[in-house]
């Protein structure tokens, strides 16, 4: 039989696996040292109480003849889709219920949606980039081109009219850089996509962290986006569902290519290859949009925002350049002393006992930069910030 040869084209290991191996080796050599992890973007605050109650209630339902649920609708239960619809409407964005598809998280849909598009399409991704965008397309054999970003453009790449792309990845606020596009900047991307008959895959996983009014929470706030964009979002960062797994994808009715309606194609794909998210999980997700749910998750988001400010304030005090941290849980900093990314990783671990993520692991344009996250414990984040500040000042 023949294997998919493109898997052999992937990098030898995943970035966070390399980090884990380095940290394990250091911990084994220095068992007495406390290591503070500000690397991988997993949340640490527990699920909201009303979310847990909704899960309990749904589990109890499943234990009764009257309340038992077997296979659900592949595209999601109406109660959750209507709650999401209301969430968009509350921000002035109109989305039809049948444009919303419930998933087990953004990462799955970011990969699965590619099945609708031919492997001959050219893909445009930013550099630095969330590695999954690249790996998903490498394994399909697509041509990938990079939109290079830098400190000079605030790590926000803009379209190059000399470049033709068919699939465009945008993540705003961005992972890993924390940078976020304004509405005017997103309009330029939408116009570019429409001109090139391209489709934007818009990763909105971090929209919940946006506080500035001039930043879009959804690509569909931008005129023309319904004709060229698919939005993918999740409850992982907004509601702490990294271990619970639930997300959603919005595919507008207007989105068509080569005479095929992509909303209908995605529905057909889901009914063929996906059996839906568990009823208990969808009930938990719906609780997020209740009055008490929104209040509780905002409390958790504020917790992470305070962590971000603690890190940012420490970097400000020692004169280190960074972006992100305000509308994002990620702080993307210039490595002090002209250190390379992995050099700074080793230095930070040795001198501060702090783990972050080397920027070069996200692409060539990340060399010399480093990502810290605000998802840690508050007290440990304060301790890490003090250690980092003192160590950098001593350089």
Where are these regions (language model features)?
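Helix C-cap/helix->beta junction micro-motif
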Residues: 30, 140, 195-196, 318, ...
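Conserved core of the PLP fold type I
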Residues: 66-193, 207-222
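PLP-dependent enzyme catalytic core of the Aspartate aminotransferase-like
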Residues: 86, 94, 124, 338, ...
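Hydrophobic residues in well-ordered beta-strands that form the structural core
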Residues: 125, 146, 202, 356-358
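Conserved core segment of the aminotransferase class I/II
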Residues: 222-302, 309, 313, 393
């Amino acid at each position: 039989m023949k294997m998919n040869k493109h898997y052999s084209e992937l990098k030898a290991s995943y970035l966070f696996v390399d980090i884990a191996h380095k940290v394990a080796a250091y911990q084994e050599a220095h068992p007495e040292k406390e290591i503070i992890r500000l690397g991988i973007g997993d949340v640490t605050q527990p699920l909201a109480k009303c979310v847990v109650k909704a899960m309990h209630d749904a589990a109890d339902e499943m234990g009764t003849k009257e309340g038992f649920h077997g296979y659900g609708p592949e595209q999601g239960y109406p109660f959750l889709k209507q709650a999401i619809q209301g969430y968009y409407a509350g921000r002035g964005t109109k989305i039809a219920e049948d444009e919303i598809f419930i998933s087990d998280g953004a990462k799955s849909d970011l990969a699965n949606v590619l099945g609708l598009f031919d492997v001959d399409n050219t893909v445009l991704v930013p550099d630095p980039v969330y590695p999954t965008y690249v790996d998903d397309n490498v394994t399909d054999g697509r041509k990938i081109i990079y939109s290079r970003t830098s400190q000079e453009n605030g790590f926000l790449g803009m379209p190059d009219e000399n470049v033709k792309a068919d699939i465009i990845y945008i993540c705003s606020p961005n992972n890993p850089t924390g940078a976020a596009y304004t509405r005017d900047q997103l309009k330029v991307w939408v116009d570019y996509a429409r001109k090139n008959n391209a489709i934007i895959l818009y990763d909105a996983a971090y929209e919940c962290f946006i506080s500035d009014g001039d930043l879009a929470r959804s690509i569909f706030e931008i005129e023309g986006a319904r004709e060229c964009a698919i939005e993918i979002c999740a409850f992982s960062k907004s509601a702490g569902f990294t271990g619970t797994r639930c997300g959603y994808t919005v595919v507008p009715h207007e989105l068509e290519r080569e005479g095929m309606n992509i909303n209908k194609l995605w529905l057909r794909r889901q009914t063929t290859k996906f059996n839906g998210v568990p009823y208990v999980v969808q009930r938990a997700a719906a609780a997020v949009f209740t009055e008490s749910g929104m209040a509780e998750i905002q409390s958790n988001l504020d917790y992470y925002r305070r962590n971000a400010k603690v890190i940012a304030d420490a970097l400000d005090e020692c004169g280190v350049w960074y972006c992100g941290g305000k509308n994002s849980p990620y702080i993307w900093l210039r490595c002090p002393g002209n250190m390379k990314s992995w050099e700074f990783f080793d230095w930070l671990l040795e001198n501060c006992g702090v783990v972050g993520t080397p920027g070069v692991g996200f692409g060539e344009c990340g060399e010399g930069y480093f990502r810290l996250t605000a998802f840690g414990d508050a007290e440990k984040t304060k301790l890490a910030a003090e250690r980092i500040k003192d160590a950098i000042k001593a350089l």
